[in-house]
């Protein structure tokens, strides 16, 4: 980014606040709450308590305020996903890339979510988490196994991350900032 772009971004940040609302979904133990903590504080804890229902957290990065709905991934909470995904700036779907047995279930739940008419066109960010583990899938394997090439009704992006080792968390934040909107 050149000096002119930096100056322009600084001027924008003085006059325009950006905001976004996103829903963080995925199966239990995928690392959704760990991702919220990594984005908010850069911190990581091995002793994470499973989310019951949902948690909401606001995080400010630069001039962007991100309202994050962290939704429980247990089967009994998955019916809530659609309700909390309506009208958001983006849907972030987190997958444990090292738990290969859970990928078919993740694919099924993701496909079910994407068929909801109320969610048409909302950008989708897929995050393959836990790439610090040797058994983690590659990005291409995850894209293939989730069938992401067939999703054509919305923007789809996929990053492989590690909340534990802070791998690609900055890229996720950059993607989120680019998908925020000016507050009116």
Swiss-Prot record:
GO terms for molecular function: GTP binding; GTPase activity. GO terms for cellular component: late endosome membrane; lysosomal membrane; plastid; spindle. Disruption phenotype: In the triple mutants arl8a-1 arl8b-1 arl8c-1, impaired multiplication of tomato mosaic virus (ToMV). It is found in: Late endosome membrane; Lysosome membrane; Cytoplasm, Cytoskeleton, Spindle. SMART domains: ARF, RAB, RAS, SAR. Gene3D superfamilies: P-loop containing nucleotide triphosphate hydrolases. GO terms for biological process: cell division; chromosome segregation; defense response to virus; protein transport. Residues 1-18 dip into the membrane without crossing it. It comes from the Eukaryota. Keywords: Cell cycle, Cell division, Chromosome partition, Cytoplasm, Cytoskeleton, Endosome, GTP-binding, Lysosome, Membrane, Mitosis, Nucleotide-binding. InterPro entries: Arl8a/8b (IPR044154), P-loop_NTPase (IPR027417), Small_GTP-bd (IPR005225), Small_GTPase_ARF/SAR (IPR006689). The keyword Magnesium does not apply. GTP binds at residues 29-34, 48-51, 70-74, 129-132. Interacts with tubulin. PANTHER family: ADP-RIBOSYLATION FACTOR-LIKE PROTEIN 8 (PTHR45732), ADP-RIBOSYLATION FACTOR-LIKE PROTEIN 8C (PTHR45732:SF12). Belongs to the small GTPase superfamily. Arf family. May play a role in lysosome motility. May play a role in chromosome segregation. (Microbial infection) Component of tomato mosaic virus (ToMV) RNA replication complexes. Required for tobamovirus multiplication, especially for efficient negative-strand RNA synthesis and viral RNA capping. This is ADP-ribosylation factor-like protein 8c. It comes from Arabidopsis thaliana (Mouse-ear cress). The lineage of its organism: Eukaryota, Viridiplantae, Streptophyta, Embryophyta, Tracheophyta. The gene is ARL8C.
């Amino acid at each position: 980014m050149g000096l002119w772009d930096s100056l322009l971004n600084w001027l924008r940040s003085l006059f325009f606040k950006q905001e976004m609302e996103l829903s963080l979904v995925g199966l239990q133990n995928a690392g959704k709450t760990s991702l919220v903590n990594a984005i908010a504080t850069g911190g990581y804890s091995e002793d994470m308590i499973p989310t019951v229902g949902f948690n909401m957290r606001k995080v400010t990065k630069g001039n962007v305020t991100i309202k994050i709905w962290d939704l429980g991934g247990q089967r009994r909470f998955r019916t809530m996903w659609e309700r909390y995904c309506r009208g958001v700036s983006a849907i972030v779907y987190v997958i444990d890339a090292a738990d290969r047995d859970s990928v078919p279930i993740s694919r099924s739940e993701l496909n079910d979510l994407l068929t909801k008419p109320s969610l048409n066109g909302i950008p989708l960010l897929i995050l393959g988490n836990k790439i610090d583990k040797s058994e983690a899938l590659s990005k291409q394997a995850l894209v293939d196994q989730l069938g992401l090439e067939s999703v054509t009704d919305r923007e789809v992006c996929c990053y492989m991350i590690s909340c534990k080792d802070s791998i690609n968390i900055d890229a996720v934040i950059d993607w989120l900032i680019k998908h925020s909107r000016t507050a009116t």
